[in-house]
């Protein structure tokens, strides 16, 4: 019974296996009032009356400290990157060959799917460790308890990268600039703050920004507009698109059961956990999906929001280029594709392909990733 209770708690309180349902509680951003309070404190406003020890004050102070820390790392990057580039040897091996990557994931998590899409498209070999969503013993080494987690070994240096967007930005910066990964990840420092519910949340500075010099940025993007566009839509995928997944795949009891059947088949569950997850999890997530629908202010028919989001993306890509990145996918293409891919095989995905204009772009993305030079992925079988 204790294990059943533990499983039910995980399914109700955590987020990510196709959802906001199998990992940790959804991140709640600071409200406009909290941010306004931070602005007054940062500006030294004497009229700001805030109670001592208030969670909002603590959040604002943490946010201010995090912002200052991010600025410090950005300035330091400009100085240090010039030295690192000067030290580069023209005879060095391709950077991707010097990395050994291990991805800790839930296969059905949209954030993990984003990272896999990036790694596959860039032909970066990696080992996959599927995490048991109940016990999570595979990531007991980490104080950061969300997935994806990427462990990267570069020579004698072993680094842990957290947060899907940070992982992608850091690796892309590493591939383009040639800076040591150990140095690159310092440009994305974590910061902690209190949200309006009084709970501590962790965010990362610069998470959508690639740390490139002007020449590298020009070669990669061709102009500031393309860089800004990529960042905007990467953030849109995280802040909006991903929140449409759970309400759509758990829309009805039948869809919820089909979704958890898929999660159990693709995930790492013990026999008892699998049975509990399929039926208890489906029932729990059907109910939770209604709460998520209200939280994110979705329409009565959540499919409409999904179709509108897909069509909004297609409109942004436009008719004159196959991808937002032009002739090849950029990081925004990979993010949107990675999020949507977790619905494959489910009714919501089939409806999306039929009732929106996204299918041609989606099929182009599939081909682009399939045509990338093949890499060898190792998925070790771990016994429960």
From Swiss-Prot:
On tissue specificity, the annotation reads: Widely expressed. Expressed in brain, heart, liver, colon and lung.
Q: What is its EC number?
A: 5.3.99.3
Q: Supply the Gene3D superfamilies for this chain.
A: 1.20.1050.10, 6.20.200.30, Glutaredoxin
**GST C-terminal domain sequence ranges:** 262-376
Modulation of this protein's activity: Isomerase activity is increased by sulfhydril compounds. Dithiothreitol (DTT) is most effective, followed by glutathione (GSH) and 2-mercaptoethanol.
Chain ranges on the Lumenal side, renumbered to this chain: 1-56
> GO CC annotations?
cytosol; Golgi membrane; mitochondrion; nucleus
Hey, which pathway is this one from?
A: Lipid metabolism; prostaglandin biosynthesis
Q: Give the reaction(s) catalysed.
A: prostaglandin H2 = prostaglandin E2; prostaglandin H2 = (12S)-hydroxy-(5Z,8E,10E)-heptadecatrienoate + malonaldehyde
Q: What happens biologically when this protein's gene is inactivated, per the record?
A: Deficient mice displays no obvious phenotype and are fertile. Loss of PTGES2 expression does not result in a measurable decrease in PGE2 levels in any tissue or cell type examined from healthy mice. Injection of the diabetogenic agent streptozotocin (STZ) at a dose to induce type-1 diabetes to knockout (KO) mice aggravates STZ-induced liver toxicity associated with high lethality, despite similar glucose levels.
Q: Which GO MF terms are attached to this record?
A: 12-hydroxyheptadecatrienoic acid synthase activity; DNA binding; glutathione binding; heme binding; lyase activity; prostaglandin-E synthase activity
- Residue positions annotated to bind glutathione are 147, 163-164
| Keywords from the named record | Cytoplasm, Fatty acid biosynthesis, Fatty acid metabolism, Golgi apparatus, Isomerase, Lipid biosynthesis, Lipid metabolism, Membrane, Nucleus, Prostaglandin biosynthesis, Prostaglandin metabolism, Transmembrane, Transmembrane helix
Q: What does this protein do?
A: Isomerase that catalyzes the conversion of PGH2 into the more stable prostaglandin E2 (PGE2) (in vitro). The biological function and the GSH-dependent property of PTGES2 is still under debate. In vivo, PTGES2 could form a complex with GSH and heme and would not participate in PGE2 synthesis but would catalyze the degradation of prostaglandin E2 H2 (PGH2) to 12(S)-hydroxy-5(Z),8(E),10(E)-heptadecatrienoic acid (HHT) and malondialdehyde (MDA).
Q: Kindly provide the name given to this protein in its UniProt entry.
A: Prostaglandin E synthase 2
Q: Which organism is it from?
A: Mus musculus (Mouse)
């Amino acid at each position: 019974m204790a294990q059943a209770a533990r499983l039910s708690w995980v399914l109700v309180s955590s987020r990510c296996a196709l959802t906001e349902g199998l990992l940790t509680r959804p991140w709640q951003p600071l409200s406009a009032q909290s941010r306004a309070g931070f602005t007054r404190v940062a500006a030294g406003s004497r009229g700001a009356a805030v109670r001592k020890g208030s969670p909002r004050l603590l959040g604002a102070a943490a946010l201010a400290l995090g912002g200052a820390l991010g600025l410090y790392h950005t300035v330091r990057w400009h100085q240090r990157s010039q030295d690192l580039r000067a030290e580069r040897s023209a005879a060095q091996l391709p950077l991707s060959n010097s990395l050994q990557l291990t991805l800790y994931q839930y296969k059905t998590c949209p954030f993990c799917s984003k990272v896999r899409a990036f790694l596959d498209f860039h032909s970066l070999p990696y080992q996959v460790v599927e995490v048991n969503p109940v016990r999570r013993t595979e990531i007991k080494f980490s104080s950061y308890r969300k997935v994806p987690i990427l462990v990267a070994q570069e020579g004698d240096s072993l680094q842990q990268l957290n947060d899907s967007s940070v992982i992608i930005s850091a690796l892309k910066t590493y591939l383009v600039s040639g800076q040591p990964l150990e140095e690159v990840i310092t440009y994305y420092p974590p910061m902690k703050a209190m949200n309006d519910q009084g709970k501590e949340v962790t965010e990362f500075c610069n998470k959508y920004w690639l740390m490139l010099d002007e020449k590298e940025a020009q070669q990669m993007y061709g102009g500031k507009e393309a860089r800004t566009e990529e960042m905007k839509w990467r953030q849109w995928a995280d802040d909006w698109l991903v929140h449409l997944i759970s309400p759509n795949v758990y829309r009805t009891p039948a869809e919820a059961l089909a979704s958890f059947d898929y999660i159990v088949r693709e995930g790492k569950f013990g026999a008892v956990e699998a049975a509990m997850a399929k039926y208890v999890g489906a029932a729990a997530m059907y109910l939770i999906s209604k709460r998520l629908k209200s939280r994110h202010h979705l329409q009565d028919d959540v499919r409409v929001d999904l179709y509108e989001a897909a069509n909004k993306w297609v409109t942004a890509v436009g008719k004159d280029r196959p991808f937002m990145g032009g002739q090849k996918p950029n990081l925004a293409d990979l993010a949107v594709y990675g999020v949507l891919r977790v619905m494959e095989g489910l009714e919501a995905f089939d409806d999306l392909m039929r009732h929106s204009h996204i299918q041609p772009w989606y099929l182009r993305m599939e081909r682009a990733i399939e045509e990338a030079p093949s890499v060898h992925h190792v998925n070790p079988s771990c016994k429960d």
